[in-house]
Amino acid sequence: MMESAVTAHTLRIAMAQFDFPVGAVTQNTDRIIEYIAAARDEFEADIVLFPELAISGYPPEDLLLRPGFLAHCEQALARIAAATRGIVAVVGWPQSAGSVVYNAASVLREGRIEATYRKRELPNYAVFDERRYFDVDPDGDNCVVTVKGVQVGVVICEDLWFAEPLAKTVQAGAELVLVPNASPYERGKHAQRDALLAERTRESGAAIAYLNVVGGQDALVFDGASVVADGDGTVHPAAAAFVDQWLVVDYAAGERSFTPVVWVDDGDESMDALAWRAVVRGLKDYCGKNGFRKVWLGLSGGIDSALVLAMAVDALGGENVTAVRLPSRYTAGLSNDLADEQCRALGVKLETIAIEPAFEGLLAALGPLFADTQPDITEENLQSRSRGVILMALSNKFGGLVLTTGNKSEYAVGYATIYGDMCGGYAPLKDLYKTEVFGLAKWRNTVGGAPVIPPAVISRPPSAELRDNQTDQDSLPPYDVLDGILYRYVDQEQSRDDIVAAGYAADTVEHVLRLVRLNEWKRHQAAPGPKVSRRAFGRERRYPITNGYSGQ
């Protein structure tokens, strides 16, 4: 954390970039009250700003349908208001008003609720479905209050992506606008956000303090990266992404400009660095918030499980991670050696349980029915399911969460065994294509000294090792081709003809698209994993399992 010298200022704003877990109303309220005291007493702030729906956490989803939950949030706001002696606080909460609920932010001062703003633009796309829960107040007022002679307005998150809410707030007299957010991370979002802030400040002339929540919530990871922008369009360097921290700024009213006072620099803002930190934060918070102190994973000596192991160690510490080597008759000696090498390097306990007894037992049990058949993918899947049973048994007996190691490419085309390698409670690589997995592994090996993933893991051909001399490319196109097609089809919703026009072979495109369609049922049963792309599998890509449409 860096601090600049305290200088004369018109307004000091303390922006609370912290994690406010969904549903933890009492915990969030206690922390908000503590943060109010810190902002007033430690930073001598005039205003303390909290994220969107800080009291309830975001997104509360169907908790908002429970009257008791809404009443609890309202009671919490009253408690918080009572703590606002000598400081102004802006706090997000779900406001119940008869039969409707608003996504609201209230201005609290000297023990009372001075004003409340109700969000006008409710996102209803991708991961958002706010119109399921919230209403827009057609008669809602602008929220502008005076703090030390400065006219301060409030709008909420999505409101900033439309010109009208900010314009109306400025027309009502605001020169400084506070924007509480709960905006989840995806690749490229920081540049998009900074461009938006520059545009909005230039067109309105208002200065903007943009606060985003931080932390993992199921498949969503909120990155923080809060930022301020001067009235002339200058966007200051952001606070660190995925870090709980204060961002304290001094606002000069006459100049409509900010001077950062307390902040944490973001450091490496490369795409790989941000994606890594998103996954690690998502994994850490999923475990912590759901009561898992340790994790298990099957370590094969391949790239996917090696990357998940490194992520788990970064998230939880090596002492809380147990890797399990599950060799079969088809496992190469190199695979065993690489698993052992990585665990030694990371200080992770490695257990070895051969799957041959379980596999042979299943073959014997099924033998009478399989007598007149030839071995095929069924026998391959029995190996994967044997591994899944063993990992889940360890979790049941000793506690801890099993991590699955599949990637987005595999989930897309069904190159994963349901109840086998898909067993587990969290999928760190779920929104990373195989080519991105390789890229992240190479990037992580450049950070912090010795490689955390053996280089031979990265360089060897990917293989499920379920039969002799098997490689992934026996069943799939090369990953650079496969991922190029998948990105266009899944992330960008391009048609078959569009993808072929981009240079991909028509028969390959048709094969890949058919696999995607056929494996919707598998994806519906997959564990959650952190969203890092514009279009992740899960709540933002809602295709029916039973689907008669085969058009492109």
UniProtKB/Swiss-Prot annotation:
Keyword tags: ATP-binding, Ligase, NAD, Nucleotide-binding
Active site: 52 (proton acceptor), 119 (for glutaminase activity), 157 (nucleophile)
Region (Ligase): 275-552
Disruption phenotype: The deletion mutant is able to grow in the minimal medium MMX, similar to the wild-type strain. The XC_0719-XC_1067/nadE double deletion mutant is only able to grow in MMX supplemented with NAD(+), but not in MMX alone.
Amino acids binding ATP: 298-305, 405
Function field: Catalyzes the ATP-dependent amidation of deamido-NAD to form NAD. Uses L-glutamine as a nitrogen source.
Record-linked NCBIfam families: nadE, PRK13981.1
Identification of the protein by name: Glutamine-dependent NAD(+) synthetase
Organism: Xanthomonas campestris pv. campestris (strain 8004)
Lineage of source species: Bacteria, Pseudomonadati, Pseudomonadota, Gammaproteobacteria, Lysobacterales
Gene giving rise to this polypeptide: nadE
